[in-house]
Amino acid sequence: LRDKSLVQTVPGPGHEPRFRLMDSVRQHAAEQLAASGDEPTAAGRLLSWMLQRLAELDGRFPQMPMMAWLACLRPDVDNLRAAFRVALADPSRAVQAVDLFARSPNFWVRAGFKHDGLLWAQAVPPLAAGPLPGDLRARLDLALAVLGTIGWVLPPAQGLAAAERAALLEKTRQRIDS
């Protein structure tokens, strides 16, 4: 496919090659997917895969050198954006949208995609008006704190308020657990 100019090779993390569809081929494939009726299934798989990928990388964030961590996720920035669009387009996926957002602020800030961080910071929190499972509300507040205090994407006062809410939720959780 590469020889016929249908895909291009791009370097992936660890210098292994990754393949990317050329724009015209990607557009044609998207049209065919929509026509087949399988688009919702494929979109759900993309969202699940991206959540799994972010969960894996989020867990390695404190231990990994920053540039290596960014190199693992940077090739998937278009997939991450597409996963956000999928999650935001379907109200039944609100919890997944919040989870995706809660796992991604370090990437948006440190990779220089602050506009994306702001876009998702404006779109996602309104989805969290109802109850959220487990520690997701605290992780949402921590994500907003990162964007407001480290990334300067949100006003610092908003980031600080989010950090305070996350700390209060953690204190409450510790009291309940003990």
Residue map of PLM features:
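Alpha-helical solenoid repeat scaffolds, predominantly canonical TPR units
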Residues: 79, 100, 120, 162, ...
